[in-house]
C-alpha cells in the first residue's frame, strides 16, 4: 500500500490542477479592470479551483462625461479649441466608446477558439457620426455646398466579416475534461432453478465509481484516461469471493490520419481569431479616424457659421445706417420718400439673413455638443451653454499639398479598411484548409490499453442445507482494495487492442460543395479587394482635385470680396454726389454681403476638403496628433488648450 500512495497522489493532483491552469486565461480575457480583492488565508486553493465556474466581473458601461468637458464651461459659455474638441471626443464620444468593446469581444472570441469553440465573429461596423447643420440646411444662404460632420471611408463598414460560419472538419474540443461518477445499486433476480445455487433469488448490492480525464489536441489526437471500480456483495454461495472488488485503469487513444489530421486543420479557428484581434484594432482605428474627421468638420463648420453670423450682423448694421441716412435726407427734402422704402426693405432682408445665420449657428452648437457628450444635451449646463470656438480657420496659402502618387502610396500602406480586407482574405484561405480536409476519407487509428484487478474476501455464505462449499480461492486475489491497486500497477492482467476505422463517403457532395463555395468566396474577396483599391485611388484623386479646386475658389472669393468692397466705396461716393441712386447702393451692399459670406463658405469648404483628403489617405490621426493607444484608453493626455489662452 505504501508503494502506490505516491502514484495515487500525483495522479489526483494532476487531475485537480488542470482546471486551475486554465483559470488565468479566463481572468485575463474577461475580467474587469477593477483590482481583485485579496483572498482570505486558506481560500486561495478554493478560489483557484472554482474561478473557472464563476461569472467573470465585467465593468458596467460608463455613461458619464469626463471632467474635461465641464472644465471648459465658464460663465455659461463653452470655450472650445479644436484641440479641446478632439480630446473631448476621444473621451466622451459614444461611437468611439462603442468601438472600444470590439477588441475585448475579439479577445473573448480568441479565448473561445483556444478551447476549440466556434467563432462568434467580431463587430466591424463604423458609424459616420453626426451631420453638420450645413448639410441639414441644404447649403442655403451664403454657406455654399458641401457637407460637414459625417465624414467617412466609403464602402468599408463590413470589412472583416461580423459573422463567421465554419465549414469543413469540426475542430476538436481543446478544453480538458475531468469526470467522476458513482452509483449505488441493489438488485434481486428470481431463479427458476434452485439446484445450482440453492437460492430462489439472487440478491446483489453493488457500489461503483469511475473517474477519468479526457483531452483532445491540435494534431487530431484524443486521449482519455479512466479509473473504474466496482464492489459487489451477493447471497450466492457459489462465489469464492464475497464481497469482491474489480478495478481497472484504461487509456484510449484515437488519432485521425486523413480527415481532421494536422495543425493546419485543427488550429484554423485559433489563427482566424488571432487575425480578428488585428481586425478589431483596425476597426477601432477606423472609427477613431472617422469620428475625429467628423468632429473637425463640425468644429470648422461652427467657426464658419460664427463668421457668417458676423458678416450678416455687419450687413444689418450697414443697412440700418443707410436707412437712417436716407430718412434724414427725406426729412430735409433732399431725397424722395420712395428711397426710404427701398432702404427699409434692405434692412428687413438683412435681418432675415441674420436670423437664418443665427439659427444655423445654434443648431451647429447643439450638434457639436451632442458629439462631445455621452449624455448629449440632457445636462442643462451643457444644453444652455453657448459654444465659443477659439480657433480660426486656416488660410490655404499656409497649407502644402503632396503629389497624387505619394498620397495613393500612403493610403495603400495605412488605410485600415484595406488592411481589414486583406486579413479577411487570409481568414478565408485558413478556412479552406478545413474544407480541403473534409474532402478526404475518415481514417482513425484506435488503441486501447487496460490493466485489470480483482480482490475480495472468502465467501462466508452457507448453502441452504447448512455448511460451506469446498472453496479454494487463489490467495493472490484475497485482500483489500490495496491488493487491487497493486495488481493494477504491476500490470498482472493487461488488455491491449489496436485497430482502425475507415469511412468513405460515396458521393461526398457536402464536402465538395463546401470546398467549391469557399474557393468561389475567396475569388470574390480578391475582386472585392481590387475594387476597394480602385475606389481608394478614385477617392484620393477626387479628394485632391476637390482640395485644389477649393483653394482656387477661396482665392477667387477673396478677390471678389475685395472688389465688392471697392465697388461699394465708389458707389457710396457717387451717391453722396448725386451720381447714383439708392437702389444701386442697396444692390451693391447686398452684393458685398454675399461676397463676404461666399468667402467664409469657401474657406470652410477648403477645410472640409482638407479633412476628407487626410481621411482618405489615413493620415488624419497623425495630422491632429492623436495617439491610438490614448484613444483606446479613453483618457487624453492633452492639456486643456482653451484654459491656456
Which stretches of residues belong to each language-model region?
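Amphipathic alpha-helical coiled-coil segments
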Residues: 98-113, 287-312, 321, 328, ...
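Acidic, low-complexity, intrinsically disordered peripheral segments
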Residues: 2-6, 10, 20-39, 119-158, ...
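Transmembrane beta-barrel architecture of outer-membrane proteins
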Residues: 81, 175, 206-208, 246-248, ...
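Regulatory alphaC helix of protein kinase catalytic domains
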Residues: 54, 60-88, 403
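N-terminal cofactor/phosphate-binding cores enriched in small/glycine residues
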Residues: 76-160, 164-193, 203-207, 212-215
